């Protein structure tokens, strides 16, 4: 019975520490996403390494969401399967990059 109580307490403490990490927001260049589900501060998004689309629990880094993008046509493919006119437009949509060039 004592072992069960200790195990229950340890599990509860582990879940509490995980929950507090999951709601924590972080700034530019800081680690985000991943197993802990760390969120970025407002005005930022969690950008994953290019080509790392649809990988469960992968971490990224917080990047600024651009407010203005120049109209330069250099298409990139987002992890959402959409082709963006340039990398700035992709970042403004808060989408990680799959690859340079149009989506297939």
Ranges and model annotations:
Residues 25-104:
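Secreted, cysteine-rich disulfide-bonded mini-domains of extracellular proteins
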Residues 10-17:
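Bacterial N-terminal signal peptides
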Residues 1-9:
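Bacterial N-terminal signal peptides that target proteins for export
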Residues 20-23:
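Signal peptide cleavage region of secreted peptide precursors
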């Amino acid at each position: 019975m004592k072992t069960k109580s200790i195990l229950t307490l340890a599990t509860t403490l582990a879940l509490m520490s995980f929950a507090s990490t999951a709601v924590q927001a972080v700034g530019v260049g800081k680690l985000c996403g991943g197993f802990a589900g760390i969120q970025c501060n407002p005005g930022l998004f969690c950008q994953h390494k290019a080509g790392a689309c649809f990988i469960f629990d992968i971490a990224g880094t917080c990047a600024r969401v651009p407010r203005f993008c120049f109209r330069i046509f250099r298409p990139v493919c987002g992890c959402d399967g959409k082709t963006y006119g340039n990398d700035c437009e992709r970042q403004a949509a808060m989408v990680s990059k799959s690859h340079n060039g149009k989506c297939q």
